[in-house]
Amino acid sequence: MESIVRVEHLSHRYTVDWAIQDINFEVNRKGILGLLGSNGAGKSTTMNIICGVLNQTDGTVYINGIDTRKNSVEAKKNIGFLPQKPPLYPDHTVDEYLTFAAEMRLMDPKKIKQAVEIAKERCSIAHFSKRLIRNLSGGYQQRLGIAQAIVHNPKFVVLDDPVLCQIRDEILNLDV
């Protein structure tokens, strides 16, 4: 089976200290990979490099067979990303935020409304469409972050601490 993500000899240094060194792994289509480790182990650094938020010091990341250093724009089209602290805009409604996220992903304007509805349903936040983000609980703000990561129907999703503020029994109801 062809991998959707392949990481080869990935390393990153912040000034003097190495955050990660010589990491290798693959994620196959329909596969799941969890990065586990203590605080400061390099989990977020690895995810940020895969998603193109941070440049690696050494090594190569392939997304759907594309070397991200050679064609990062094409590679990023395949990725949905929820950072550890997603940038939420408190004065926007849920619908406005998800529409903006879809527009930033250069989605066909004719498909955005339906994509927003699907993402809200998959994350169980459809009933908050017109609510301001500031008025959502931390758990629902996290679900909104997940919805923005999947609104453009990416080939794979990278979620950094996705169950933050979630009730244990409700985590299983997310359709991501």
Region locations from a protein language model:
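Walker A (P-loop) phosphate-binding loop of ABC-type ATPase nucleotide-binding domains
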Residues: S38-G42
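Conserved catalytic motifs of ABC-family nucleotide-binding domains
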Residues: N153
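Conserved ABC transporter NBD signature motif
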Residues: G59-D67, E74-A75
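Conserved ABC ATPase signature
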Residues: L132-L136
